[in-house]
């Protein structure tokens, strides 16, 4: 396995060849794994050499992830969880069937005694996907009108890595985790994907459109980078 070394510490690399890439890409995952993506025209030796030049940056990001205390939800009575910019207080209720519902400022979780957090988690994700779609559609409609495009079909999925994507048929898929974020971030992610309908890249024209649609988008980006890891179910 290839690796880089910085300050006496060896950092293993997971090398992935990609026909779609034009440049070498480095990704540091929250698990600490370092992914090195290589285009066809660059040798692994050249790519590893490039990664070595970025070893300090790689180590800094791995250390940052290691210092983070993992966010764990137990779905216990009195615990809180965000939803579309507000905090919901969890209330546990005994019942025959597992279900989750939002009542006022409460997230009411019903289920038999001994129901595990993983079961309630699935119920909450299902609820957020259903209710979140109702709240996202007006934003999508408004932003689409400002962008001069037809409002896209919207789907919400539970995804590990991507916050969202624009499909080849101009639909948008959003990560259910965005519903745990502040409204500013939610709006930014909608703007980001709708801007991709006309700009299928991250070049200057794309970012110009994002800024036109949402001048304060950089504030949302900073929040996403700093706190996104805490928005988990």
Where are these predicted regions, by residue range?
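Active-site-proximal or metal-binding-adjacent scaffold patches in catalytic folds
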Residues: 1-187, 197-233
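Walker B beta-strand of ABC/ABC-like P-loop ATPase nucleotide-binding domains
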Residues: 190
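Walker B catalytic acidic pair
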Residues: 193
């Amino acid at each position: 396995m290839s690796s880089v070394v910085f300050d006496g510490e060896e950092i293993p690399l997971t090398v992935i060849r990609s026909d779609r890439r034009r440049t070498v890409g480095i990704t540091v995952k929250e698990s600490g794994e370092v992914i090195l993506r290589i285009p066809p025209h660059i040798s692994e030796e050249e790519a590893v050499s490039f990664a070595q030049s970025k070893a300090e940056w790689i180590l800094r990001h791995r250390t940052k992830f290691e210092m983070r205390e993992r966010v764990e939800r137990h779905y216990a009575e009195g615990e809180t969880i965000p939803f579309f910019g507000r905090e919901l207080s969890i209330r546990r209720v005994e019942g025959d069937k597992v279900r989750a519902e939002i009542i006022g400022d409460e997230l009411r979780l019903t289920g038999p005694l001994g129901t595990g957090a993983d079961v309630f988690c699935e119920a909450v994700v299902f609820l957020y996907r259903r209710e979140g779609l109702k709240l996202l559609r007006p934003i999508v409609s408004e932003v689409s009108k400002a962008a001069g495009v037809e409002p896209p079909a919207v789907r919400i999925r539970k995804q590990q890595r991507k916050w969202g994507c624009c499909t080849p048929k101009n639909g948008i898929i959003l990560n259910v985790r965005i519903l745990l974020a502040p409204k500013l971030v939610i709006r930014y992610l909608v703007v980001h994907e709708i801007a991709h309908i006309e700009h299928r890249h991250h070049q200057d024209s794309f970012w110009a459109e994002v800024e036109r649609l949402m001048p304060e988008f950089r504030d949302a980006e900073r929040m996403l980078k700093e706190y996104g890891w805490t928005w988990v179910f």
